[in-house]
Amino acid sequence: MNNRIIYVVSDSVGETAELVVKAALSQFNGSADDTHVRRIPYVEDIGTINEVISLAKADGGIICFTLVVPEIREYLIAEAEKANVLYYDIIGPLIDKMETAYGLTAKYEPGRVRQLDEDYFKKVEAIEFAVKYDDGRDPRGILKADIVLIGVSRTSKTPLSQYLAHKRLKVANVPIVPEVDPPEELFNVDPKKCIGLKISPDKLNHIRKERLKSLGLNDKAIYANINRIKEELEYFEKIVDRIGCQVVDVSNKAVEETANIIHHLKTKNI
């Protein structure tokens, strides 16, 4: 295997194919040092394939490839066999077996692994954003967010932020309390990005009483006082009017239902 070249051909980045090739090379003592792995990514035309086959024929190289488009894959195999060039299809046979096993047809779209990776990292980024800018912790997040949720205590701001983060939306939430002026950023944000979470006084009274009980506290505390709750909700309405944002009533809705409404509003406003 001295001075051998292995051509790694892919219709995407080619990382998968290169890792497989290097894993195989590691089984031959010292051979990896004498073998050059040359990656050729984003191959989408037969012209590039012809060039690679010519190079491999000239220097006795091997072609290893991950090509998912059937026409391109079949062309490489046919031309390599005509030229007596060694080749190995890394992904094709596995896709064929999976089609048989699942009774489904593959999408045959190059780069789907990278698309999935990007989707995953966007989701992680959104979740981290929701944690960082939860409960008005840092008002700078308001202007960076895709969605800003506002509401009095116990209107599901935090669980909604996390749920929407799993849809790759960056969400900041801000508590509305009569004794505390909302951050100025809240009045500078695009009103279409802001959603007010409305709730009926009786429903909120019940939720807060149950919350106090779960903490082993007296449910007669001011936190669950109906007059105090009405005062908070009146203040909330004033802030909503000042911002000019949309409102979603969360009184009798599950988090998932409210999140889907908010997601729909966000999509409609794009």
From Swiss-Prot:
Q: Can the keyword Kinase be found in this entry's annotation?
A: yes
Task: Identify which top EC class this enzyme belongs to.
Answer: transferase
Q: Name one GO molecular function term.
A: phosphotransferase activity, phosphate group as acceptor
Q: Which InterPro entries match?
A: Kinase-pyrophosphorylase (IPR005177), PPDK_reg (IPR026565)
Entry binding sites for ADP: 151-158
Catalyses: N(tele)-phospho-L-histidyl/L-threonyl-[pyruvate, phosphate dikinase] + ADP = N(tele)-phospho-L-histidyl/O-phospho-L-threonyl-[pyruvate, phosphate dikinase] + AMP + H(+); N(tele)-phospho-L-histidyl/O-phospho-L-threonyl-[pyruvate, phosphate dikinase] + phosphate + H(+) = N(tele)-phospho-L-histidyl/L-threonyl-[pyruvate, phosphate dikinase] + diphosphate
Do you know which Pfam families this protein is assigned to? Kinase-PPPase
The effect of disrupting this gene, in the record's words, is: Lowers the level of gapB and pckA transcription threefold under both glycolytic and gluconeogenic conditions.
For this UniProt record, give its keywords in alphabetical order, as a comma-separated list.
Kinase, Nucleotide-binding, Serine/threonine-protein kinase, Transferase
Under what conditions is it induced? Answer: Constitutively expressed.
Q: What is its EC number?
A: 2.7.11.32, 2.7.4.27
Tell whether Nucleotide-binding is among the UniProt keywords. Answer: yes
Family membership, please give it: Belongs to the pyruvate, phosphate/water dikinase regulatory protein family. PDRP subfamily.
Q: Which PANTHER family match?
A: PYRUVATE, PHOSPHATE DIKINASE REGULATORY PROTEIN 1, CHLOROPLASTIC
Cross-referenced NCBIfam families: PRK05339.1
The protein's job, in short, is: Bifunctional serine/threonine kinase and phosphorylase involved in the regulation of the pyruvate, phosphate dikinase (PPDK) by catalyzing its phosphorylation/dephosphorylation.
Q: What is this protein called?
A: Putative pyruvate, phosphate dikinase regulatory protein
Q: State the encoding gene.
A: yqfL
